[in-house]
From Swiss-Prot:
This is Uncharacterized protein BA_2834/GBAA_2834/BAS2643. Belongs to the proline racemase family. Disulfide bonds: none annotated. It comes from Bacillus anthracis. PANTHER family: BIFUNCTIONAL TRANS-3-HYDROXY-L-PROLINE DEHYDRATASE_2-EPIMERASE (PTHR33442:SF5), TRANS-3-HYDROXY-L-PROLINE DEHYDRATASE (PTHR33442).
Length: 345
């Protein structure tokens, strides 16, 4: 078969949300840090992200991971997180999906009952424990980068009213909002309304507030909106729905969103150190999380969290890139997000 370029992926889902892990075909990325490699990817090879994420090969909430050589001397593997909306410094459900794919495809040595990895990500070093039985990844736990509350805001939003939100970071920036306060019921049949309100709120917040990570200036702008409400699953403490860029719903409880939520709960003395917290998604899937340590980020109080979830292997793809295909980079039928990742400073 004659084709110009071939990309091989392993597809998994974590709590219903997809991860497409690219295992071959990625050019060598340059940079002394994973953030620099991510920005090199964006500048020179963004067409690969579009090919793999956008329709007709992907869909509006497709996400994935690119495996690279790590930059950190203690890391085993470098990971860059991608989605239809662009690039993420960190992604929890993708981390669970990537590690499950690595184990079950035999790409890394497997140690039972626990295989430990250190991932180098644009957000920092992430330590992972994969619980393995009979060669299968049963659960994945990762210690996330420090999570913190950046600010609490109140903003008037046209056609919605006064919105109160905690702007919290757990690997991405989240506006964490009580769903009932903005007239939302977090059920699949209300998905369109949830997305519309989230995008409207996100745009207003980005217009009126400066949101920048105090240590990594390339991480800026509100990208995710996380609504929460009472749980419906008997094992859960909170039910959430996260709207991801550019405008789709995370089917999982969202790993970095769970870290951000734990930062809010801990700061408000609503959860204790090492107390288990179970987060439910809009489709009923669950993540477990807990605060395992405290730290500081630029003189702000922060927490280190451990997030646990499971992913499922779905299959493999070989994608062919044909220069003559008029839709070689795909398309999206939703508006692009205005926020852009800036250069590393």
């Amino acid at each position: 078969m004659r084709t110009q370029k071939v990309f091989t992926t392993i597809d998994t889902h974590t709590g219903g949300n997809p991860t497409r892990t690219l295992i071959s075909g990625l050019p060598k990325l340059l940079g002394e840090t994973m953030a620099e490699k991510m920005l090199h990817m964006k500048k020179e090879y963004d067409w690969i992200r579009k090919l793999l994420m956008n329709e007709p090969r992907g869909h509006d909430v497709m996400s994935g991971a690119l495996l690279t050589d790590p930059c950190h001397p203690d890391a085993d593997i470098g990971v860059i997180y991608i989605e239809t909306g662009g690039y993420l410094p960190m992604c929890g459900h993708d981390t669970i999906g990537v590690c499950t794919a690595l184990i079950e495809s035999g790409l890394i040595p497997v140690v039972e009952p626990i295989t430990s990895l250190k991932l180098d990500t644009p957000a920092g070093l992430v330590e992972v424990d994969i619980f393995v039985r009979d060669g299968k990844a049963k659960e994945v736990s990762f210690c996330n980068i420090p999570a913190f509350i950046l600010k609490h805001i109140t903003v008037d939003v046209e056609n919605i009213g006064t919105v109160e939100a905690d702007i919290a970071y757990g690997g991405n920036f989240y506006a964490i909002i009580d769903a009932k306060s903005v007239g939302l019921e977090l059920v699949p049949e209300h998905a369109s309304t949830i997305i519309d309100k989230a995008i409207h709120i996100r745009n207003i917040i980005n217009e009126r507030f400066e949101i920048i990570h105090p240590e990594y200036s390339f991480i800026r702008g509100l990208t995710h909106v996380e609504f929460y409400t009472d749980p419906t699953h008997e094992s859960a403490h909170v039910k959430n729905t996260v709207v991801v860029p550019p405008g789709g719903i995370d089917r999982s409880p969202c790993g970095t969103g769970t870290s951000a939520k734990l930062a809010v709960l801990y700061a408000n003395q609503k959860i204790e150190m090492n107390e288990e917290f179970v987060h439910e998604s809009i489709v009923g899937s669950l993540f477990k999380g807990c605060v395992i340590n405290t730290t500081n980020v630029a003189n702000m109080e922060a927490v280190v969290t451990k997030i646990t979830g499971s992913a499922w292997l779905m299959g493999m793809h070989r994608f062919f890139y044909n220069e003559k295909d008029p839709l070689k980079e795909g398309f999206l039928l939703i508006p692009p997000m205005e926020h852009e990742t800036e250069d590393v400073k």
